[in-house]
Amino acid sequence: MVTIRLARGGAKKRPFYQVVVTDSRNARDGRFIERVGFFNPIAAGQAEALRLDLDRIEHWLGLGATVSDRVSSLIKDAKKAA
């Protein structure tokens, strides 16, 4: 099953997440189909905290992809800000 979820990057104690489309059987930080955005939970100042390609996310949802709980709330925030 295809899912849209977060893949963790960054350094220890300084997380940075990629929003990726992947097969649910793949590892959290493993192979993915497409990168559709990023989320920086510790963004400060003028740093961009969230960027999502909503068109591509809608495309994948139309094809039957499921969304993780956290990504669902991020999509909601991005739509509210747009």
Swiss-Prot record:
Pfam families the UniProt entry points to: Ribosomal_S16
Example of a GO cellular component annotation carried by this entry: cytoplasm
A GO term, aspect molecular function: structural constituent of ribosome
Keywords for this protein: Ribonucleoprotein, Ribosomal protein
An individual GO BP term: translation
Domain of life: Bacteria
Entries under Gene3D superfamilies matching the protein: 3.30.1320.10
Family statement: Belongs to the bacterial ribosomal protein bS16 family.
Cross-referenced PANTHER family: 30S RIBOSOMAL PROTEIN S16, SMALL RIBOSOMAL SUBUNIT PROTEIN BS16M
Protein's UniProt name: Small ribosomal subunit protein bS16
Protein species of origin: Pectobacterium carotovorum subsp. carotovorum (strain PC1)
